[in-house]
Amino acid sequence: MRRILVTGAAGFVGGHVLPRLAAAGDRVAGIGRGGAPRLPEGVAYETIDLLDEAALSAFVARFRPTEILHLAGLASVADSASGPGQTWRVNVNGLMNLVAAVEAVPGCTFFFVSSGEVYGSAFLAGHALTEDSEPLPRNTYARSKWVGEQLLRDLLPRIGVKLVVLRPFNHIGPGQDERFVVASFAGQIARIEAGLVPPCLEVGNLSSYRDFLDVADVAQAYAGLIGRAESLPDGRVFNISSGMPRTIASALDGLRDRARVPFEIRIAPERVRPAEIPLAAGDAGRLRAATGWRPLVAWEDSLTRVLDDARARLAASRETGRGADPRS
């Protein structure tokens, strides 16, 4: 039986991957900064900050994982730009603390969730990139992930821990907060429908092409790779992507078609990223060859799920009197 530790278990992706890992019959434990999320039966959870080295080391030594899925970290490009110091502290110092803790469990496999963002300027080639493309990160978040990859390649072999690098591209789904573009559109639409704000949706650059996946497909990719940990080569990198880029405008159009009321669109200068990459897409052929994975959730269903979730969360927040927190 595997003993799988998931960091960042209370976050967006954690809520989708924990049930898949638990369903395989393995022992699963999660850690995160927040309180315990709704957990599948049999999954343990403990509130631990990655920057608390002592607590982290004690938990790893006690649980003794055979696989680690490292989801935890700051994931917003915009937040990283406005607060680079905190990004480096969490994404690199926190990672260093986890590596120190993992010294207690030689022989385990460390699945590091990096990001398709690390390719950066390489996307200017204008086509879907394979894992052989040279990363040329362009922002603080991407640089922190690329440094994390290099750090692990240096440190894990010294302690007998296998490394597998995961580079997911944009993913959407229930539970994502509004720092991310599709969730932001959905949250704004839900508030417009409820009459809480004027019927005007604020957007940034709509012409960029991005490689979107449903979070359920990303979670399945993670679970499939973890289930084959023994056969994966040390240091292997896997893109997790559809290979079918779509414009951000097409996501907005799809949500607009599902909206219950009409609304206008306004370009908000503060939402426009400087020097935006026109097209970012990944080739996941290596992942398909290794596990047979392919995306199963239709794009239209993903958009419906995102908007329904935004409506449900808004309704729940109004019932409890909290108002609508776009970052929840």
Language-model features and meaning:
Residues I4-A23:
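N-terminal Rossmann NAD(P)H-binding glycine-rich loop of SDR-like oxidoreductase domains
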Residues G15, I68, S82-F111:
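NAD(P)-cofactor binding segment of oxidoreductase domains
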Residues A122-H127, Q150-R210, V215-G224, P245-I248, ...:
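NAD(P)-dependent short-chain dehydrogenase/reductase
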Residues C200-L201, N205, D234-F238, R246-D253, ...:
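C-terminal "lid/loop" region of Rossmann-like NAD(P)-dependent oxidoreductases
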Residues V215, V237, S250, P269-D301, ...:
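Conserved C-terminal active-site "lid" loop/helix of NAD(P)H-dependent oxidoreductases
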